[in-house]
A protein has these predicted regions:
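Short pre-active-site segment immediately N-terminal to redox-active cysteine/selenocysteine motifs
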Residues: 460-462, 466-470, 502, 541
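Non-catalytic, surface beta->alpha helical segment in thiol-disulfide oxidoreductase systems
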Residues: 540-544, 550-571
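A non-transmembrane, solvent-exposed segment enriched in polar/low-complexity residues
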Residues: 38-218
């Protein structure tokens, strides 16, 4: 290190002897070391955070009231709007439809998977925090296109303070870090974000955030967590974007632009108590973004089975034994003879599902320097286990999910994780086993609308694509499917492209469809009809797709159609 006396403000030495010079050199090194230590100090735990006032109840499902009024409505007087969100434990979207009276008022008791942030479809209302047991009140003035949020308990406190708090601590960065794919700028930007994070942590630790004065401890916990989540979510999104943008069309990375997740997120380990092992992240305003991107970018060993660990859903038919050479996980329905045959392919190395998940956890902790399998790791593993996006009722699927849940349980120590793991699986089994016994008399308006859409094309394989003109992935998917639509134009296969006419007006939508020769059936729904279907299928993002067999049964959700699958359904 080059020393600069002026930078450390030391006077000139009194003598020129070697002993004196050595003494001053040691003093200079001591001063610089002290400066570096002060500069690099990181707060590992935050005083008074969390406060311990948020009990387990708020991590569980419950009800809340949404009420309010629309005044001075000048646009189309829609009769419903949707409250949407994500169950951050099961990773499933939820949609609750709110009915508007003729005078513009609304009052609805809705169920929530846990306290957290919700969004609003079809109306200009900002995101809102809502706690189970509370009331969220919304007043919307159509003449100025303004919504005011209030409510009871912590719901009212958080929604009152958060807009001002977010503005106070929002980033001053104006350039997106992946702009121009400048690796040096990306890393410098990351360092500035870590500094922002540390400034927020310091303000929380020293209790100097004046906007929190007068708030309950519960509200303070939610608001402080939302502040911590802001820069963390921005860094996760930036790395996600960087990962995709620095790869070629065939998915290969550019070595000159590669940034490893382990080096980019090297700041997590010393801050893990409030970033990685913090259950309150599910209550943060950006909590969903943090958890979703954490799952894909940092903790993807669970999701993608990284580190050369591979696990596939295979049967144990003798003609498929060769496929196990890529798989060292014991199949759930093996017998001793089969076991011996598999060992030949895997050179004697087979482990249980529980051991496999333990290996994944060990790998993540080692890679990112984490001292324990904290809440965030447990949550992302739970998402892996609770991936139930399969519409069949095959016994093998139920058995495999039970095996995966049993294998993951040793990794779960957080009470809220354990609760949701068992509760979601219980509901999954009830729904699967109860499908055949569902009484048609219990059908909803959404069921009736869906049935009417299917009946028009009865006897056909139906691919339903819920899209919007402003959705890039939707448009790209439709363009990619043109060859497939043409290939099956004379077969009993129908492609239905369904949109909300309010969000996708006919003129620009039909122009896109015509200009790009998008064939198929094009259906424009009213906002109320769209809300019925989003509520029925519980989706709040598009594209959302359904593949339906010739008997009217849903066989796949959110899976792009393929010729192989269509041919299978046509047999």
């Amino acid at each position: 290190m080059k020393l600069n006396r002026k930078s450390i403000l030391l006077p000139s030495p009194l003598g020129e002897g070697s002993g004196v010079r050595l003494l001053w050199l040691l003093l200079a090194l001591f001063a610089l070391t002290a400066q570096a230590q002060v500069k690099s100090k990181v707060i590992t735990t935050l005083k008074g955070y969390p406060s311990g006032t948020i009990d387990e109840y708020h991590f569980h499902a419950g009800n809340a009231v949404v009420m309010g009024r629309f005044t001075n409505r000048t646009e189309h007087k829609f009769s419903t709007f949707n409250v949407t969100g994500t169950d951050l434990f099961s990773n499933q979207d939820f949609v609750r439809t709110i009915h508007i009276e003729s005078d513009g008022s609304f009052l609805e008791l809705i169920s929530l998977p846990h306290s957290g942030w919700v969004y609003f479809d079809g109306v200009e209302i900002p995101p809102a925090f809502i706690a189970v047991g509370d009331t969220l009140e919304i007043q919307v003035d159509g003449s100025v296109n303004e919504a005011k949020l209030s409510g009871s308990g912590v719901t009212g406190e958080v929604n009152s303070v958060w807009p001002r708090l977010e503005s106070q601590f929002s980033s001053k960065e104006t350039r997106t870090p992946w702009e121009g794919l400048d690796r040096k700028f990306m890393l410098e930007w990351k360092n500035r974000k870590v500094k922002e994070l540390d400034q927020i942590a310091s303000a929380i630790d020293s209790d100097t955030i004046t906007l929190l004065n007068g708030c309950s401890h519960h509200a303070k916990d939610v608001l402080k967590t939302s502040l911590l989540a802001m820069p963390l979510e921005q860094m996760l999104v930036a790395m996600h974007q960087w990962w995709w943008r620095t790869r070629s069309e065939d998915g290969k990375a550019n070595p000159a632009l590669t940034i490893s997740a382990a080096s980019f997120f090297d700041f997590l380990s010393v801050r893990q108590s409030y970033l990685m092992d913090n259950p309150l992240m599910v209550f943060a305003a950006d909590g969903g973004g943090v958890i979703n991107n954490m799952e894909f970018i940092v903790l993807n060993a669970y999701l993608f089975l990284a580190n050369d660990m591979q696990r596939w859903s295979k049967t144990t038919d003798s003609d498929e034994l060769g496929n196990y050479k890529q798989n060292f996980i014991l199949p759930h329905n093996y017998d001793p003879a089969l076991h011996r045959e598999i060992l030949v392919f895997d050179k004697g190395h087979l482990v249980s599902v529980a051991d496999y998940y333990a290996m994944c956890s060990d790998s993540i902790r080692s890679r990112f320097g984490l001292s324990n399998t904290g809440f965030m790791m447990q949550l992302c593993l739970l998402h892996r286990v609770l991936d139930f996006d399969f519409e069949g009722s095959d016994d093998w699927f139920l058995t495999r999910k039970a095996e995966e849940l049993a294998g993951a349980i040793p990794q779960f120590t957080a009470p809220s994780i354990c609760h949701h793991a068992v509760d979601v699986y219980r509901r999954f089994v009830i729904e699967r086993e109860g499908n055949a016994r569902m009484d048609a008399s219990n059908s909803t308006p959404g069921d009736s609308l869906f049935q009417s859409l299917k009946e028009k094309y009865a006897g056909n394989v139906i691919y339903m694509d819920f899209w919007g003109i402003g959705c890039g992935p939707c448009r790209r998917g439709m363009l990619d499917q043109r060859t497939l639509v043409e290939q099956y134009k004379d077969a009993p296969v129908r492609f239905l492209y369904i949109c909300n006419e309010k969000d996708s007006p006919r003129e620009p939508s039909e122009k896109f469809l015509t200009d790009n020769d998008i064939q198929g059936e094009h259906i424009f729904l009213s906002s109320d009809e769209w809300n019925l279907l989003t509520s029925k299928f519980q989706f709040n993002a598009i594209p959302f797709t359904l593949l339906i067999d010739r008997n009217g049964n849903i066989v796949e959700k959110n899976v792009p159609p393929t010729a192989a699958k269509l041919d299978e359904l046509l047999k």
